[in-house]
Amino acid sequence: MRKKLKAVLFDMDGVLFNSMPYHSEAWHQVMKTHGLDLSREEAYMHEGRTGASTINIVFQRELGKEATQEEIESIYHEKSILFNSYPEAERMPGAWELLQKVKSEGLTPMVVTGSGQLSLL
């Protein structure tokens, strides 16, 4: 027996909104202020990871150690503040139309994110 589809899940970053340029810039700038190197291009490679994971990868490479919980919280907080200072991300092409189509078919569109950034939740 086929089950009736009730909802469609959409990721936010890179699916509904083009926010990655802002995420990569914020990561790059915050790491730079801490004397750490994370290029904008490399930040894209870490998309989908938790902030703690990204920070620890950079700490391991640059400092040969894991970041403390305090360092993780501080750096991620700084990154979030900087990200939130940027203009609102543009919708991805076709995202609005697709959401409207989903709704017109009687389905519930739902947004999901792996982000722990409170401003996005």
Annotate each language-model stretch with its function.
Residues R2-E42:
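Active-site neighborhood of HAD-like aspartate-dependent phosphohydrolases
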Residues K4, N84-V111, Q117-L121:
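Short, acidic loop-to-helix structural element flanking the phosphoryl-transfer center
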Residues F17, G48, M110-G114:
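Active-site-adjacent beta-strand anchor residues
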Residues S19, E42-A43, E71, P87:
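Conserved acidic
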Residues M20-E25, A52, Q117, L121:
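Short, surface-exposed alpha-helical segments at coil->helix boundaries
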Residues E25, V30-L63, S85:
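Alpha-helical substrate-recognition element adjacent to the catalytic core
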Residues G48-F83, P93-W96, K101-S104:
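A metal-dependent, Asp-based hydrolase signature
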